[in-house]
Amino acid sequence: MTQTNGFDALHAHAQRLRGAAIPALLAAEPERPTQYAWQVGPLYFNFARQKYDRAALDALFAIARERDLAGAFQRLFRGEQVNVTEQRAALHTALRGDLTDAPVASEAYATAAEVRQRMGALIQQLEATDVTDIVSVGIGGSDLGPRLVADALRPVSGARLRVHFVSNVDGAAMQRTLATLDPARTAGILISKTFGTQETLLNGSILHAWLGGSERLYAVSANPERAAKAFDIAPGRVLPMWDWVGGRYSLWSAVGFPIALAIGFERFEQLLEGAAQFDAHALNTPLEENVAVLHGLTAVWNRNLLGSATHAVMTYDQRLALLPAYLQQLVMESLGKRVKLDGSTVDSDTVSVWWGGAGTDVQHSFFQALHQGTSVVPADFIGTVHNDDPYAENHVALMANVLAQTEALANGQDSSDPHRSYPGGRPSTVILLDALTPQALGALISMYEHSVYVQSVMWGINAFDQFGVELGKQLASQLLPALKGESADVADPVTRELLSKLRG
């Protein structure tokens, strides 16, 4: 990005604005509170407290045009091989809508719709049995997305099926889950793209034995033959996924099977509808009015021009408490790259460390550092305008905290006592859902997906591979024999010492 024609001008704006007070920016642009705000379907965004002005934004958009961001969106949606290192398309958008005339994308959409029909039929069959509980086994993209959506949208009471998620290879996770269930009234779903994932295979074996066989086991995989063979699951209970959908983008596919079981098939389809509606905004809206583009460019601005190394996400709705963990994978696995598409080293920093939690709990843990620490941490504050629980006063208090915290972070407060002085200048974006509906959550997740893609295009990196996770898995596989007491050649001296401690 630093090699673009417009970077010097952008850098000059950053130098001008780095020390600017956010109240001064608001005073210089009196219409900023509304001009930097957008309503897209059920989502409202306000960027007025970010540390840029119109001139800096124009410079950002100029680089986005130089990077052919609009063309990059076309290539993504049309099913071109944007995942160049694996020579694959990234057609997660086709799982929820058909927005182009590209045959590849249209075929993917039709295939996904057919699999959803099969999934709906399996759900009807399950609901007609005496099964009351589902154990969903997966990890990473096979777990974080489904777990987030199921937790956010599950009924408060009266659910026909209860879904439990197990991801960690630590046996305690499976033990605690199964201890509360009756094997005669439980079914299991094993989700793995390759069906070679160690955690899923080990936990799947435990679940298979506990259930007494495969009669109530289902699977989702891009390798359905291996899935069926590994646990003797009938082919009719194995749903496919595809190599043109990355795990962290897959909740819209049959990986969403546990979502549909937890919230109902109709509401699962509404989730997809909401995502498709935001997809249309991302694909068809001019850059300057495109919220996904602005969100992504804001992240680039804060990372590369203002030097922020981390980004916080605070969800002021308890039902979205798992969103920060989901976004950690979506953002950091997608953007944690140090080489560009052509294999050369990047010329700027890439991904920030994403983290966060649920408000107001986090105000009593890490907000001290946000307000008075030495690091400036940009943040997203996410809340809901309307809440459907019966405790209206609580929701008012919750939203009062969103307003108060974002104002305090931005404006600060002087004091004669330095210990009680707040420097301010902490930028934030406020995102409000009209209500936490399937459509709104689908749109919100879609927005973050496209924001990630924007950042990858600006940095010239591949958002759709994850080779960084492989080395550790390979070494773990090689060390298993040594931990079991078998002879093994372990070259690393620290690993040898740790092995001796673990083996007693």
Curated annotation (Swiss-Prot):
Transmembrane segments: none annotated. PROSITE patterns: P_GLUCOSE_ISOMERASE_1, P_GLUCOSE_ISOMERASE_2, P_GLUCOSE_ISOMERASE_3. Gene3D superfamilies: 1.10.1390.10, Glucose-6-phosphate isomerase like protein, domain 1. The keyword Cytoplasm applies. SUPFAM superfamilies: SIS domain. Its EC number is 5.3.1.9. Pathway: Carbohydrate biosynthesis; gluconeogenesis; Carbohydrate degradation; glycolysis; D-glyceraldehyde 3-phosphate and glycerone phosphate from D-glucose: step 2/4. The keyword Ribosomal protein does not apply. Keywords: Cytoplasm, Gluconeogenesis, Glycolysis, Isomerase. It catalyses: alpha-D-glucose 6-phosphate = beta-D-fructose 6-phosphate. The active site is at 333 (proton donor), 364, 473. GO terms for cellular component: cytosol. It is found in: Cytoplasm. GO terms for molecular function: carbohydrate derivative binding; glucose-6-phosphate isomerase activity; monosaccharide binding. InterPro entries: G6P_Isomerase (IPR001672), G6P_Isomerase_C (IPR023096), Phosphoglucose_isomerase_CS (IPR018189), SIS_dom_sf (IPR046348), SIS_PGI_1 (IPR035476), SIS_PGI_2 (IPR035482). GO terms for biological process: gluconeogenesis; glucose 6-phosphate metabolic process; glycolytic process. It comes from the Bacteria. HAMAP family: G6P_isomerase. Belongs to the GPI family. PANTHER family: GLUCOSE-6-PHOSPHATE ISOMERASE (PTHR11469:SF1). Catalyzes the reversible isomerization of glucose-6-phosphate to fructose-6-phosphate. This is Glucose-6-phosphate isomerase. It comes from Xanthomonas oryzae pv. oryzae (strain PXO99A). The lineage of its organism: Bacteria, Pseudomonadati, Pseudomonadota, Gammaproteobacteria, Lysobacterales.
